[in-house]
């Protein structure tokens, strides 16, 4: 009888304790949430090297090249003429006048390697607002 009062058999718990598992999962979730914006902001764009490029024929129509040399810095090149450091409005006016003079003019956009790709997109939008429907991208940096 003394045995039953003092030292009874303890029942073992057969449940799984998931609190440590949840702690680890929440810490991992916080780490991923903190690093996800950093990963998406640091994506670098490497321009491909074109192995099969087509040469632009300049028999009758010399190509009009819009060079993006920096943020908001545009240069329009037609044959030997270089119009440097043009504001976006003047680029649109120059491209529009060239396009209206000859709709078959070839337009190319080139950018320096250190220029953010967003500036190339802005140059594409400028040519689109000037009425140009087809634009080529130069694969060799300027």
UniProtKB/Swiss-Prot annotation:
Q: What is its main location?
A: membrane
Regarding the membrane, this protein is recorded as: Single-pass membrane protein
For this UniProt record, give its keywords in alphabetical order, as a comma-separated list. Answer: Cell cycle, Cell division, Cell inner membrane, Cell membrane, Membrane, Transmembrane, Transmembrane helix
Question: Which GO cellular component terms, listed alphabetically, does the Swiss-Prot or TrEMBL entry include?
Answer: cell division site; membrane; plasma membrane
- Pfam families noted in UniProt: ExbD
Q: Which GO terms describe its molecular function?
A: transmembrane transporter activity
Q: Which residues lie on this side of the membrane: Periplasmic?
A: 39-142
Q: Where is this gene product found?
A: Cell inner membrane
Q: What does this protein do?
A: Part of the Tol-Pal system, which plays a role in outer membrane invagination during cell division and is important for maintaining outer membrane integrity. Required, with TolQ, for the proton motive force-dependent activation of TolA and for TolA-Pal interaction. The Tol-Pal system is also required for polar localization of chemoreceptors clusters. The system also appears to be required for the activity of several outer membrane-localized enzymes with cell wall remodeling activity. (Microbial infection) Involved in the uptake of group A colicins (colicins A, E1, E2, E3, and K) and in the uptake of filamentous phage DNA.
Other remarks on record?
There are about 900 TolR molecules per cell.
Q: How does it assemble?
A: The Tol-Pal system is composed of five core proteins: the inner membrane proteins TolA, TolQ and TolR, the periplasmic protein TolB and the outer membrane protein Pal. They form a network linking the inner and outer membranes and the peptidoglycan layer. TolR forms homodimers. Interacts with the N-terminal domain of TolA and with TolQ.
Against HAMAP family, the record matches this protein to: TolR
Write down what this protein is called: Tol-Pal system protein TolR
């Amino acid at each position: 009888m003394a045995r039953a009062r003092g030292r009874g058999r303890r029942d073992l718990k057969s449940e799984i304790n998931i609190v440590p598992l949840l702690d680890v999962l929440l810490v991992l979730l916080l780490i991923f949430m903190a690093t996800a914006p950093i990963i998406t902001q640091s994506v670098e764009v490497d321009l491909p090297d074109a192995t099969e490029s087509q040469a632009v024929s300049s028999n009758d129509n010399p190509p009009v090249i819009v060079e993006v040399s920096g943020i908001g810095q545009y240069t329009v090149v037609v044959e030997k003429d270089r119009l440097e450091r043009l504001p976006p409005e003047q680029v649109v006016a120059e491209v529009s006048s060239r396009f209206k003079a000859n709709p078959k003019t070839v337009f190319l956009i080139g950018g320096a390697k250190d220029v953010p790709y967003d500036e190339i997109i802005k140059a594409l939008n400028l040519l689109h607002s000037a009425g140009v429907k087809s634009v080529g991208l130069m694969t060799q940096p300027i």
